[in-house]
Design a protein with these regions (language model features):
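Composition-driven recognition of low-complexity segments enriched
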Residues: 1-269
Length: 269
């Protein structure tokens, strides 16, 4: 029999999704959000949800939204932040540093030293309880980032005004500061009034608050998550698309849900 060729006859695209693709997606989400793989019962439950129509955006969104309600989500995110910006400092190290500062306070009559180390303890206690405060909704993710850079551990890693300012831009904005930004940031760090990112400030706290309310910071959050989940930089269109609602809503977790519920993260077209 002869084969019959029909001109312009193109078969429809194959829209099926292999089971292994669904299972891999589920495990990727668990690892990214909870820091561990799904156990068999969890895998089966998620598979049943997604198997019926893995191309359904709403089904993937529901799956990811359930994951970010898990207590391990907050612990994993805190561990990621501490690993990225604080050399992986843990709760025991924080508690030990607080104890050292408390001992210094009880060993001196110098009022300046007492006030200095009392302030250091406050900053470390904010870091110590940040995870629970964030989980309880008492602070935003931006507050969490400010606490992360406002303690003696971060200061020791990024010692001095120049290193500190550069670290903010490189860690959270994915670029080096301009000469003007660097000089203004250094002035604020050293307690001298200056105009930084078009806003007036006079000290290190102002430096932090101005930076973490800037467009550069929110665009950097988008870049951070794209590199974490997609291993690539976002396009300029994607930066604008995702940073705008982030600036308006201040909802970091919502952005994570959008990215992990995407077809790109699942690995389908």
């Amino acid at each position: 029999d002869k084969e019959i060729w029909i001109k312009d006859n193109v078969p429809p695209p194959d829209l099926t999704v292999e089971d292994i693709v669904i299972e891999n997606y589920i495990q990727k989400c668990y690892i990214s959000l909870l820091g561990r793989k799904a156990v068999p019962d969890e895998l089966n439950e998620a598979f049943e949800l997604l198997r019926e129509n893995p191309r359904d955006d709403q089904a993937r969104k529901e799956f990811v939204e359930d994951l970010v309600l898990h207590p391990l989500y907050f612990k994993n995110e805190i561990n990621t932040i501490r690993g990225d910006y604080l050399n992986g400092v843990d709760s025991t190290e924080i508690a030990n540093q607080i104890a050292i500062f408390e001992f210094i306070i009880t060993s001196t009559n110098n009022e300046f030293e007492i006030e200095l180390f009392e302030n250091e303890i406050i900053r470390l206690e904010n870091l110590q309880f940040a995870a629970k405060s964030w989980e309880n909704g008492e602070i935003t993710t931006t507050d969490l980032h400010i606490i992360t850079v406002n303690n003696s551990f971060y200061d020791d890693i990024n010692m001095g005004s120049e290193n500190y300012v550069v670290s903010l831009f490189q860690n959270f904005a994915f670029r080096y500061p301009t000469v003007a930004e660097l000089n203004a940031g250094k002035s604020l760090f050293d307690g001298a009034p200056s105009v930084f990112l078009l806003q007036s400030g006079k000290n290190k706290n102002d430096l932090q608050n101005i930076f973490f309310s800037s467009t550069q910071y929110y665009e950097g959050v988008v870049s951070t998550l794209f590199q974490r989940y997609f291993y690539r930089n976002p396009t300029s269109f994607e930066v604008e698309l995702y940073s705008k609602p982030l600036i308006e809503e201040k909802n970091y977790t919502s952005l994570q849900v959008k990215l992990l519920a995407s077809k790109e993260y699942m690995g389908i077209k």
